[in-house]
Amino acid sequence: MGTRKSKASPPAQARASMKKDLPEQFRDYRHVWVFMELERGHVHPVSFELLGEGRRLADQLGVQLAGIILGPPGDSTLHAAAEAFAYGADLVYLVEEPLLTDYRNEPFTKALTDLVITHKPEILLLGATTLGRDLAGSVATTLLTGLTADCTGLDVDEDGSLAATRPTFGGSLLCTIYTLNCRPQMATVRPRVMRMPQRSNKPIGRVIRHDWRMLEEDIVTKVVGFLSDDRSGNANLAYADVVVAGGLGLSNAENLLLIKDLALTIGGDYGCSRPLVQKGWMPADRQIGQTGKTIRPKLYIAAGISGAVQHRVGVEGADLIVAINTDPHAPIFDFAHVGVVTDAVSFLPALTEAFTKRLAPANRLRVVN
């Protein structure tokens, strides 16, 4: 996913009528940048996904792809630079400063905006994570440029402008947004929306160190400690290989046990559509779709889910989608690979039993070995 153009994209003639001449101060902005998000010294996977997408955009534009790294001096920051090259970057802009050890909006915004003003990128991409959303908004505001959030598709049009597609009107429509008269063109993309690129053995390229300083007394926010939010019960749907999800077709909260049993049987995780969270049947971290988690599993089983646009954009990156619904005209059958027109409540126990029987010999073999 990430290359599909929305029907909402205006024709070239309509865009031409909206487009003014790019102001003189923006005409030398070039290249594609990806902000590399570090989590306690480790690169967030969404950064690699964005490097893959950024590589494609840079090749279309005939420009370079740069990874942007803000962090403290040390091996973890240099390792992040090496990883940027392995996932497609041509060069890395590096700001090493002890004040950037932990994320705080003020120093990160100042460092990134200084980099942009100095080196003038045409496109700047960030992950739509908690950190990325906070940083992207403040950087765009500081630079007086546009920002398209939570994109499901990125492309370059015939004029070389970034076409950023995202759902709108509660997920019922897709729109394509352009930043025509400001630079850089900024967009955020959630984890797992873009495909993870293949890691290469590309040698380390050019690293440009940017000398940047800020005084601690100029920063309002102070870090007093770090408490991990690594709770074992939290859903990790975004990176699960197998996901089973339920919707309103399950009829009541008790029937959620059916998707949990199936997920447990086939070694997967479970989730739900937005209406079930709104009803209080499942917590928000189990929601799948544009306003929840975006998933890209090898197998996705949707039970009793109609498949509205906001759900579709969160799941259509799956390798195999199996849809179970009583309505043969449900939108989910338009993009599912396998469709079963039946009552999910009756079908799920039979499916779980079939998987149990099929997997039993393999399970016994693993125990013996």
From Swiss-Prot:
Biological processes, Gene Ontology terms: fatty acid beta-oxidation using acyl-CoA dehydrogenase; nitrogen fixation
Region listing for Disordered, in residue ranges: 1-20
InterPro entries recorded: DHS-like_NAD/FAD-binding_dom, ETF_a/b_N, ETF_a/FixB, ETF_alpha_N, ETF_asu_C, ETF_asu_C_CS, Rossmann-like_a/b/a_fold
Cross-referenced Pfam families: ETF, ETF_alpha
Signal keyword on record: no
Record keywords: Electron transport, FAD, Flavoprotein, Nitrogen fixation, Plasmid, Transport
GO molecular function, a single term: flavin adenine dinucleotide binding
Binding locations of FAD: 299-327
Gene3D superfamilies: HUPs, TPP-binding domain
Subunit structure: FixA and FixB form a heterodimer.
Functional summary from the UniProt entry: May play a role in a redox process involved in nitrogen fixation.
PANTHER family assigned: ELECTRON TRANSFER FLAVOPROTEIN ALPHA (PTHR43153), ELECTRON TRANSFER FLAVOPROTEIN SUBUNIT ALPHA, MITOCHONDRIAL (PTHR43153:SF1)
Family, similarity comment: Belongs to the ETF alpha-subunit/FixB family.
Protein name from the UniProt record: Protein FixB
Organism: Sinorhizobium fredii (strain NBRC 101917 / NGR234)
